[in-house]
């Protein structure tokens, strides 16, 4: 299907038909077979390191960073399912789903507890000073992927930044 060149870039041997995915408020997001393609942004390299760290820690809820394609787009693994887009389906608002989302967030915080925070990775505006972890900062229902009525993934790490774990917890409760 594809291969990595000597620079670690991902190349497709045959262009697969791409499907534009819904969402992607900041950039266009495309699916090509079992991958997602998104344009690179300032800070993408940091997010790629984060995704690699999560994979190494066994956090299977995040997409895997696979490389950069010939069009300078990041290539991520596709998480099968549907995003929690509005209007929410009834099951997405259940107590059981909220408990599973809370577990997923806890596992994320555990996985990033030893992630090295680079000096140039600044907290978001108005973040409280007690930095504990690399917060996702958008752990919201619309970034959670559901399959068989269960949360199976979290996407969109673009605004991840250092902060207190309670910052992520409060935002998740507010948006879920």
What are these regions (language model features)?
Residues 1-11:
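Short, Lys/Arg-enriched N-terminal segments with co-localized hydrophobic residues
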Residues 16-52, 86-87:
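ATP-binding glycine-rich loop module of kinase domains
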Residues 31-34, 146-152:
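Active-site beta-strand-loop-beta-strand hairpin of nuclease catalytic cores
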Residues 57-67:
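Conserved HxN/HPN-centered segment at the entrance to the catalytic loop
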Residues 67-101:
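Conserved structural core of kinase catalytic domains
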Residues 87-120, 132-137, 142, 146-147:
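Conserved kinase catalytic-core helix
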Residues 150-176:
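Active-site Asp-x-Gly
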């Amino acid at each position: 299907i594809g291969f990595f060149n000597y620079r670690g870039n991902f190349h497709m041997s045959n262009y697969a038909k791409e499907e534009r995915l819904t969402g992607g408020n900041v950039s266009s997001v495309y699916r090509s077979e079992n991958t997602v393609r998104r344009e690179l942004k300032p800070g993408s390299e940091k997010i790629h390191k984060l995704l690699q760290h999560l994979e190494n820690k066994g956090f299977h809820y995040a997409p895997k960073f696979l490389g950069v394609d010939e069009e300078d787009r990041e290539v991520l693994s596709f998480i099968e399912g549907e995003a929690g887009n509005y209007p929410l389906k009834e099951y997405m608002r259940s107590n059981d789903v909220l408990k599973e989302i809370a577990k997923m967030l806890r596992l994320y915080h555990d996985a990033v507890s030893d992630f090295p925070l680079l000096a140039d990775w600044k907290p978001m505006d108005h973040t409280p000073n007690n930095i504990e972890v690399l917060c996702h900062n958008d752990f919201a229902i619309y970034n959670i992927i559901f399959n068989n009525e269960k949360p199976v993934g979290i996407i969109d790490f673009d605004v991840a930044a250092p902060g207190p774990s309670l910052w992520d917890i409060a935002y998740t409760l507010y948006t879920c």
